[in-house]
Swiss-Prot record:
Record-given protein name: Dioxygenase cdmD
Keyword Oxidoreductase (UniProt): yes
Pathway note: Secondary metabolite biosynthesis; terpenoid biosynthesis
Applied uses, from the record: Compounds in the chrodrimanin family such as chrodrimanin A or verruculide A exhibit strong inhibitory activities against protein tyrosine phosphatase 1B (PTP1B) and therefore, they could potentially be developed into drugs for the treatment of type 2 diabetes or obesity. Furthermore, chrodrimanin B, the end product of the pathway involving chrodrimanin A or verruculide A, does not exhibit the PTP1B inhibitory activity, while it functions as a potent blocker of insect GABA-gated chloride channels.
Family the entry assigns: Belongs to the PhyH family.
Keywords: Dioxygenase, Iron, Metal-binding, Oxidoreductase
Subunit structure: Homodimer.
Job description of the protein: Dioxygenase; part of the gene cluster that mediates the biosynthesis of chrodrimanin B, a meroterpenoid that acts as a potent blocker of insect GABA-gated chloride channels. The first step of the pathway is the biosynthesis of 6-hydroxymellein by the polyketide synthase cdmE. The prenyltransferase cdmH acts as a 6-hydroxymellein 5-farnesyltransferase and produces the hydrophobic metabolite verruculide C. The FAD-dependent monooxygenase cdmI further converts verruculide C into verruculide B.
E.C. number: 1.14.11.-
Keyword Ion transport among record annotations: no
GO MF terms, alphabetically ordered: dioxygenase activity; metal ion binding
Source organism (scientific name): Talaromyces verruculosus (Penicillium verruculosum)
Binding site for Fe cation: 146, 148, 226
Gene transcribed to yield this protein: cdmD
């Protein structure tokens, strides 16, 4: 199925005053929405200060082998590596590194309101798949268009437009996202493409850049084709992605290694996001238990008051 979108009007721009029902409608129709002022400038500055050292020490995307693409198919694991970028840093472990991430990001009320609308009826509880700082240096080439749900084998079996979505991403701008410094490129409506629609990897006329000011966010479904743009500027481009999915799925990023004292400084909701609490599916059946008991009870887990 091919879906035609008016590029001049998408992604729609919303703020916290926009009715949540309208926001969800835009996400389901276009696959993405831009949120103005998702985080305030002071919070962005605190987050930047907490991650700066780790980003500076971090290495660029994983090296990949050079394949003769005309001679045969490139292994899928190498395709994944190419998506990491030779001049892009992926700084992970945010829940350990940043107090602002633990307190402000993981408890973001609007973010959770969106997740509840997307997942509640279909799946029940949800948790964090992963969270990264995405730092693009000048000279980084455009990333190929892809769907983040490709990490799930089950995504190949989604066939109908009304099949449930099982990943939603919140990409927050920590610096400006401009067309010349690698703003994320989105193909609105591509979450509705079925197997009959040939995938688009580079240079799509249907793609639009997500132009953002620091603190803005683009919220997009994992089934939407997207990719980081080319950084033709002299500035780095930095963002933070927080990926959420149903509790049914195993996250890409584990948080078992977090010291208990750090986890106990978090709210119950934030603890759930990093897998330190038992959750329920859409039928109120417990998921992620310790025997027949809740993880938090077995661990005698303390928590911070609601943030």
């Amino acid at each position: 199925m091919t879906v035609t979108i008016n590029k001049s009007s998408v992604p729609h721009k919303v703020d916290f005053a926009t009715p949540l029902s309208d926001v969800i409608c835009h996400i389901k129709e276009d696959g993405a929405v831009i949120v103005r002022g998702f985080m305030d400038v002071e919070t962005i500055q605190k987050l930047q200060e907490e991650v700066d050292t780790a980003v500076e020490k971090g290495s660029f995307g994983p090296r990949y082998q050079e394949y003769n693409e005309e001679a045969g198919e490139i292994p899928k694991h190498e395709i994944y590596k190419r998506g990491e970028g030779k001049k892009t840093k992926h700084m992970k472990n945010l829940a350990l590194t940043s107090e602002t991430f633990r307190n402000d990001v993981l408890n973001h009320k609007w973010m959770h309101a969106v997740c509840e609308q997307i997942y509640g009826e279909e799946f029940g509880d949800y948790w964090m798949n992963c969270a990264h700082i995405l730092h693009l240096e000048p000279g980084e080439k455009a990333q190929f268009f892809h769907r983040d749900t490709g990490v799930y084998r089950v995504s190949d079996f989604r066939r109908r437009l009304n099949d449930p979505e099982f990943m939603i991403n919140f990409l927050v701008s920590l610096t400006e996202f401009r067309e010349d410094n690698g703003a994320t490129q989105l193909i609105p409506g591509s979450h509705k493409w079925d197997a009959a629609h040939p995938p688009t990897f580079y240079g799509s006329d249907e793609a639009v850049p997500a132009i953002l000011e620091p603190g803005d966010a683009v919220v997009y479904l994992g089934s939407l084709f997207h990719g980081a743009g080319e950084n033709r500027s002299l500035d780095y481009r930095r963002g933070m992605i927080v990926s959420m999915h149903p509790a049914h799925f195993t996250p890409m990023e584990s948080h078992f290694h977090l010291p208990k004292e750090i986890v106990e400084s978090m709210t119950p909701l934030a603890q759930q996001m990093v897998g330190w609490r038992t959750m329920n599916n859409q039928n109120k059946i417990p998921i992620w238990q310790a025997g027949d008991d809740k993880i938090e009870d077995v661990l005698r887990l303390q928590h911070k008051e609601v943030y």
